[in-house]
């Protein structure tokens, strides 16, 4: 009986070690994927717990710049640079700012060193070609769940867990970009200058050149 129990414990330990090793491999693949992201345009659909659905395009120009461009009638645009993340509300005509480390897309901008410093991997769940990663952002004390497709090596979904809401962002199409128009990532004081340009899909796609690679 003791021998059987001992063998069972050994088998369990070996299975745990194998699972841990596999998780480390998948996490390494995920980190490598993040490192390869340089300049991209991402079509996305965002839905919250209350059923509100909005669409937009996320532009990333590493290491610091991004633009979360929601399409009308949703009234927000979020522009991030090295020093600030600025959000403009076209309906309220108001600006709010946070530090770059607090923005919800920060993990896409981090390099490997900063990622390990600012984020904690809490769990990895494998489901065939998909694995779900739960990460904890130490600076904002928020959790997110990332759905990563191992076959095509691409993020498919991001869930952001807020106090009374869950925001689910589905990445519909990811395009590599050769060059962005500089004005996409500039945010001037709307009280002195005009507000950031409000762009629909066809307009924003004229402001970058798709990479041929």
Swiss-Prot record:
Keyword terms: Signal
Domain of life, source organism: Bacteria
Keyword Signal in annotation: yes
Tagged with keyword Transcription: no
Listed Gene3D superfamilies: Lipoprotein localisation LolA/LolB/LppX (2.50.20.10)
Signal peptide: 1-21
UniProt cross-references to InterPro entries, sorted A to Z: LolA/LolB/LppX, OM_lipoprot_carrier_LolA-like
Pfam hit, one: LolA
Protein name: Uncharacterized protein RP864
Biological source species: Rickettsia prowazekii (strain Madrid E)
């Amino acid at each position: 009986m003791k021998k059987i129990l001992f063998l069972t414990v050994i088998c369990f330990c070996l299975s745990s070690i194998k699972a841990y090793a596999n998780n480390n491999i998948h996490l390494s693949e995920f980190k490598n994927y993040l490192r390869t992201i340089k300049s991209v345009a991402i079509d996305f659909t965002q839905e919250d717990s209350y059923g509100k659905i909005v669409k937009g395009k996320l532009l990333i120009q590493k290491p610091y710049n991004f633009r979360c461009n929601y399409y009308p009638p949703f009234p927000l645009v979020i522009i991030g640079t090295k020093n600030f993340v600025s959000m403009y509300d076209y309906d309220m005509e108001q600006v709010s700012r946070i530090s770059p480390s607090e923005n919800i897309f920060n993990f896409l901008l981090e390099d490997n060193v900063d990622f390990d410093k600012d984020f904690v991997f809490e769990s990895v769940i494998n489901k065939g070609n998909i694995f779900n990663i739960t990460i904890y952002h130490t600076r904002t004390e928020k959790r997110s769940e990332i759905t990563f497709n191992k076959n095509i090596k691409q993020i498919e979904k991001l869930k952001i867990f807020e106090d009374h809401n869950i925001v689910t962002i589905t990445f519909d199409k990811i395009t590599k970009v050769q060059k962005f128009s500089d004005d996409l990532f500039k945010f001037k004081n709307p009280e002195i200058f005009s507000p950031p340009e409000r762009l629909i899909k066809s307009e924003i796609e004229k402001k970058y050149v798709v990479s041929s690679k």
